[in-house]
Amino acid sequence: MPKARAKKSEQTRRYDKNVIKAAQFDISPRDFSRNALNVVEKLQRQGFEAYIVGGCIRDLLLGKKPKDFDVATNARPEQIQNIFQRQCRLVGRRFRLAHIMFGRDIIEVATFRANHSDARNENQAKQSNEGMLLRDNVYGTIEQDAARRDFTVNALYYNPQDNTLRDYFEGIKDLKAGKLRLIGDPVTRYQEDPVRMLRSIRFMAKLDMFLEKPSEQPIRELAPLLKNIPPARLFDESLKLLQAGQGVKTYRLLRQYGLFEQLFPALSAYFTEKEDSFAERMIVTALTSTDERVADKLRINPAFLFAAFFWYPLREKVEILKNEGGLNNHDAYALAGNEVLDLFCRALAAPRRHTAVIRDIWFLQLQLLKRTGSAPMRTMEHPKFRAGFDLLAMRAEIEGGETIELAKWWHEYQFSNGEQREQLIQEQQRLHPKPKKKYYRPRRRKTTCSAE
């Protein structure tokens, strides 16, 4: 009996060591989403453990305003559904989650996970030959759940009931040091989910942190494992990486660790030692523009970003088809567009709504060459004209020469009145008159007279 009491006392001491008063970091329930607090409170009233978890706590500790609030609990998905009824929707097969709906606001609730080696059957956990977790639904305790998190700075739990934090892997200490550290063996954790390599880059750029050496070293060697990730998931991850406001910084890090070519293998042929090819300069120019738009809280369109990324590979393919296949400009663009988008979507499965816009932006580059007659007004009426013009302006910055003159003309045309526009068109017609059609005299048909 005394032995059991001693064991319990040891657990209590270990537990208390990991429980920290949130008030010392100026954190209180008012910093959290009302809906997330309601979910935690309802689960706790039903006798379950429940905490607000992960990135929102990390962001609050860094003085940032969180965007999302997630909850972790020891309630199973079916139990969560019984509590929240029609307000709850269960999602995911690989990683079973509950979404609690508050109108347009969704609170994601996950059941505490244990090590997948504790699984009793393949319905709970399953791994591929490369070590990737195909299913991860082994449930456990809060301590086990913390060990399943990716980085120490994300393994933080908040209990609004007593305003305390739980930190099992010194995440707060790492956060103060600006250090990203994987929980567990880095090789194993990257093999379990190769997307963790991309998450490490995203957090380095977003949080301005460094990746500790043991977590950093395996990335370049394990980068090819990203080929095992479904292209649709990689597309979503690419948006998180490149459209969060740190696109240029993220791109540099992805190149540094050999990850960019895994996401965009069709672009790797255009990489140079000095990183100064037209394609590389376009990537940086497009990402700089995206970062500025995010900072200004303007709308961003992923289709524009990828249309810019693949513009020079498209141009190269167009010239090949024209020179070797004898195709006209329009047909060469259509066929080249199909081939380039096919290569893009093999790695990142972009939805059709995006690929359709990418095509529009590319074809507008042809239309922008037409500056006489009624063509300019028809081009300006195209729904994607502004995106097409923005790509032209970026090309002018990179290519110089005639492209600068073309971009200037269209800038002036957009902001001119009717009379000024007509003058601009007439000037173009004077500079580039249509060749006169040659008049061919019809030949007289020869008639053959039969001899009588």
From Swiss-Prot:
Q: Which InterPro entries match?
A: NT_sf, PolA_pol_head_dom, PolA_pol_I, PolyA_pol_arg_C_dom, PolyA_RNA-bd, tRNA_ntf/polyA_polymerase_I
Pfam families, alphabetically? PolyA_pol, PolyA_pol_arg_C, PolyA_pol_RNAbd
- Organism superkingdom: Bacteria
Enzyme class of the recorded protein, top EC level:
transferase
Q: What is its EC number?
A: 2.7.7.19
Q: Where is the segment annotated Disordered?
A: 427-452
Gene Ontology molecular function: ATP binding; poly(A) RNA polymerase activity; RNA binding
Among the GO biological process terms of this entry, one is: polyadenylation-dependent RNA catabolic process
- For the keyword Transport, the answer is no
> Is Zinc a UniProt keyword of this protein?
no
Locate the compositionally biased regions of type Basic residues.
Answer: 431-452
Catalysis performed (reactions): RNA(n) + ATP = RNA(n)-3'-adenine ribonucleotide + diphosphate
Q: Active site located where? A: D68, D70, D150
Cite the entry's keywords alphabetically.
Answer: ATP-binding, mRNA processing, Nucleotide-binding, RNA-binding, Transcription, Transferase
- List the PANTHER family: POLYNUCLEOTIDE ADENYLYLTRANSFERASE FAMILY PROTEIN
Tell me, in a sentence or two, what this protein's role is. Adds poly(A) tail to the 3' end of many RNAs, which usually targets these RNAs for decay. Plays a significant role in the global control of gene expression, through influencing the rate of transcript degradation, and in the general RNA quality control.
The Swiss-Prot or TrEMBL record describes its family as follows: Belongs to the tRNA nucleotidyltransferase/poly(A) polymerase family.
Q: Which named protein is this?
A: Poly(A) polymerase I
Source organism phylogeny:
Bacteria, Pseudomonadati, Pseudomonadota, Gammaproteobacteria, Pasteurellales
Q: What gene name is listed for this protein?
A: pcnB
